[in-house]
Amino acid sequence: LIAVLIATPALAQTPSNIEAVEYDPNGSQWFVSCGSSTMLSTSDLGDTWEYFGTAQATHGMEVMGEALFVLDNNLIRAYDLNTAEQIGTASVAGASFLNGMGNDGNGILIVSDFSSGRILKVDATDPADMSVSTLVGNTGTTPNGIVVDTENGRAVIVNWGGNADILAVDLESGALTTIVNGTGLGNCDGIDMDSDGRYYVSSWSPNRITRFSNDFSQSETVVSSGLSSPADISFDETNHILGVANSGSNQVTFHQFEAEVNGVDIIDSNEASEVALLGNNLTFQVAQPGNYNISAFTLSGKLLDSMAIDIPAGTTNVSLERLPRMMQNAAVIHVSGTDLDQSFKLGLRQP
């Protein structure tokens, strides 16, 4: 398991009022919704952001074919991925709060109405002439994020509220089933799948990303730090990167995971833990998850600040720019933990 955390820096175009993130494999770019402001895109994992034409999105987004479909204040809009021009729009009668969206890759969108509990099916084969029907009249829950599991002919839905359930709805019949009866997670927001069929779920209580096996029989926490009210998520299956829209901080974070070989993560549990300073990142390579302490000192040895951080198993990059302000002026950074005790000289930043 590799979890890499990269935060977007403050630039001329900066994400704001964010709620959703979506990866476009056609253009190797990420989109982020910015509420009433123009949508932004990045091709360098958030180092720089650019306007995507004049497109707008308030909530869920899905790339399907050559179009980007978005939810925008209870409208469904379609934009051409190459030109950013709007190529279609659909209104939904009786919509209360359109929130999450998934697609089957073959012209069908599945949309959640957060407030009414409805699940909608949208035929978007022709983006200029979309048609909307009700797949589920009321889930009895507060449905949020959706991902379409095409192999099993279902949409998988996470829900808002305490100890939230995970539901599945048959794409043809609309039959509703409970996959997980009580996840132990509160206010689940986003869900997506990786190329191995595993599910990633974002939750606000606690702030974390949980990964479920493809049959939901097992779960594990894969990201537990660097998140703030994580909303919609998207998984880049080619590069094994999870993008998270943190609505609490208006930051998009990217978390890289290692691919599996025969269902097993490529991690040697016998390897000793290591940390290295690579560019502007502290790169941890640990076999088992653990808690580590990062301390910042002046060149003369004066302690500026310290912090504890949970590091998952695998490789994790911690950007120095993400550290508290006092630590960013350090001349020496010291990392300590159960199996680590190492210092790095950063330069003459403080007397």
PLM-predicted stretches and their roles:
Residues 303-326, 340:
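Glycine-centered tight-turn motifs at strand-turn-strand junctions
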Residues 258-281, 302, 343-351:
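Residue-level detector of functionally pivotal "anchor" positions at catalytic/ligand-binding pockets or at interdomain
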Residues 78-122:
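Hydrophobic alpha-helical segments and helix pairs
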Residues 38-40, 76-77, 117-119, 163-166, ...:
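Structural signal for beta-propeller blades
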Residues 43-47, 80-85, 123-128, 170-174, ...:
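Short loop/turn segments that connect beta-strands within beta-propeller blades
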Residues 297-303, 331:
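Short, glycine-anchored, charge-dense loop/turn motifs used at functional sites
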Residues 14-28, 35, 53-73, 92-109, ...:
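Beta-rich, blade/repeat-based domains predominating
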Residues 13-14, 46-53, 85-91, 130-137, ...:
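A short beta-strand motif characteristic of beta-propeller blades
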